[in-house]
Amino acid sequence: MAKKSMIARDVKRKKMAERYAAKRAALMAAFNAADDPMDRLEIHRKIQALPRNSAPSRIRNRCWATGKPRGYYRDFGLCRNQLRERAHKGELPGVVKSSW
């Protein structure tokens, strides 16, 4: 189980990224469309002025059952340990143990 403070920090980052997503996307579109280097520099400064935690790259994928950040499977939203446990119990429809 991950520390509750780390899980809370990640939730805070998700909310902040959602809040600033439109503004960040507009600035990035303007940055990519700008031809003048001075305009690009000004827009870049505005992007840098946004809160650091509003960047989507700072959000960490976490297991919804345990909060673990490592060994995360996107298809299920679970870490590898929980995926194995729940697959053995039959709680994941369509997941079967492979044999050949």
Curated annotation (Swiss-Prot):
One of its GO terms (cellular component) is small ribosomal subunit. It comes from the Bacteria. One of its GO terms (molecular function) is rRNA binding. GO terms for biological process: translation. InterPro entries: Ribosomal_uS14, Ribosomal_uS14_bac/plastid, Ribosomal_uS14_CS. Keywords: Ribonucleoprotein, Ribosomal protein, RNA-binding, rRNA-binding. The keyword rRNA-binding applies. The keyword rRNA-binding applies. Gene3D superfamilies: 1.10.287.1480. Belongs to the universal ribosomal protein uS14 family. Part of the 30S ribosomal subunit. Contacts proteins S3 and S10. Binds 16S rRNA, required for the assembly of 30S particles and may also be responsible for determining the conformation of the 16S rRNA at the A site. This is Small ribosomal subunit protein uS14.
